[in-house]
Amino acid sequence: MSVTQVSNSLLADGSVTSAKLAAGAGGAFNNFLIKTTAYTAATRDQLIVNSSSAVTITLPASPSAGNVVFIKNAGAGVVTVGRNGSNINSQAQDGTLAADASATLVFVDSTIGFKEL
């Protein structure tokens, strides 16, 4: 079975086209990336980290307000969330995700940095 998700913004004109379907919804929980080694996230990345050893996921450099990154630790190893110069929850330190933990991080401003929802 194949399911295609389309956002309302793509259908604002009321028409469904193959180009709109190919563009995807661009919304939450779409196009997850599976990572087993260190990776620098891009804005809107939705990552599942699956590793038995420690892995570092580095947040995007020079983020803008509203940028979002989702990270899920599906492995046994600890995931370090590298702040890449931005604060995380107003703190100038990296974060960690234990096994089976997840975080949705939204960039607010240079003081708060990425805020965990």
Where do the protein language model's features map onto the residues?
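Short hydrophobic/aromatic beta-strand or adjacent loop that forms the aromatic wall/cage
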Residues: 101-104
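Fibrous stalk/shaft segments of extracellular and virion attachment machinery
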Residues: 1-33
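Exposed extracellular interaction/assembly regions and N-terminal maturation sites
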Residues: 22-85, 107-117
